[in-house]
Regions:
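Multi-pass membrane proteins that catalyze or facilitate reactions on polyprenyl-/lipid-phosphate substrates
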Residues: 1-159
Length: 159
């Protein structure tokens, strides 16, 4: 299922970029113009990430591109959409490990949190800047090549 999802979503990335290039989809919508209906559709698309091999960020960006949102704004919204889940999961982990947390050196924990947060900001900024001058086709090809590599590896019983 993972190999199929990687391949299929890769094809969708390529198809969407082809339709954009052919002017069948125009990327004019801005985040500030998002309607409640748009938000519901994006949320429904995000739920497809429950399927193994389907990227939550990727499926949200695909949905937003189909709806006509600009690439970089789709990426920003996709990453912002992940924040509540990441924060909730982090607090749940901290709660589950509260006994260890009491013994932990909070300085090291704080440094780790800060470095991870800073790295995430740098990565998101780089990705948004990348999308200002590039398409998502490279990610479509990446997913297709990875799916083919995994399929070959599975057939040869390497993995």
């Amino acid at each position: 299922l993972i190999v199929f999802s990687l391949f299929f979503i890769g094809l969708i990335f390529l198809l969407i970029e082809f339709l954009i290039k052919q002017k069948k989809i125009e990327l004019r919508k801005r985040l500030l113009s998002m309607s409640y209906f748009d938000a519901v559709l994006i949320g429904l698309a995000q739920s497809l990430a429950i399927v193994p091999g389907v990227s939550r960020a990727g499926i949200v960006m695909i949905a937003m591109l189909i709806m006509g949102f600009r690439r970089e704004e789709s990426a920003i919204y996709s990453f912002l959409l992940a924040l509540p889940t990441i924060i909730a999961a982090s607090f749940l982990d901290l709660y589950k490990e509260r006994a260890l947390l009491a013994q932990a050196n909070l300085v090291y924990l704080s440094i780790g949190f800060f470095v991870a947060f800073l790295t995430a900001i740098i990565a998101v900024r780089w990705f948004v800047n990348f999308l200002k001058n590039h398409t998502l086709a490279v990610f479509g090809w990446y997913r297709i090549i990875l799916a083919l590599f995994l399929l070959i590896a599975l057939r040869l019983a390497i993995i």
